[in-house]
Amino acid sequence: MESIGRYSAAIYRLSQSIFNNKLKKLEISSGQYDFFLVIAQNEGISQKELGDRLYVEKSTTAKAVQYLKAKGYICKNRVEKDKRYSSLYLTEKGKEVSAEVESVFSEILGIFSKDIPESVIKETIQVLKKVINNLHEEKSKYAGTFSD
């Protein structure tokens, strides 16, 4: 049976394999590149906002942030108004590789959209956003029963 989930999973697996290959020398894997890019494009973002933007759980975000920090690509600065929160920034090392990571991302987006009209891409994105919203609505019905 055909389903959005099956095709989404295949796209995810194939793209992750390409990302892993292209970013191997930087020691940034498919599990971290999206976190890296969001931080690069939104320096000062909080860890919570980072996870929210990527639709991932707190523990997943924490692991990715810790990995990128350990590799020297990002740093965390405590928020003055509330010491419980940290803002995330690229380090000099992170800034040095940022263009390369963004280039790989752009290259893979080009592969995704090869021979597909822009109008179809935009429509597909709108459909996928609706699917995500539907899933979030369903998840909210079970507040407290999912791990976040």
What kind of feature is each model-predicted range?
Residues 1-26:
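N-terminal leader segment of winged-helix/HTH proteins
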Residues 16, 67-126:
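Charged, amphipathic alpha-helical coiled-coil/dimerization segments
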Residues 32-36:
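Short alpha-helical "packing" element that flanks the helix-turn-helix/winged-helix DNA-binding module
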Residues 37-41, 102:
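Short, locally clustered residues in the helix-turn-helix/winged-helix DNA-binding domain
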Residues 42-46:
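Short capping segments at the starts of secondary-structure elements
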Residues 47-48, 59, 66, 86:
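Residues within helix-turn-helix
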Residues 51:
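The alpha-helix within a helix-turn-helix
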Residues 119-148:
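C-terminal regulatory/oligomerization modules of transcriptional regulators
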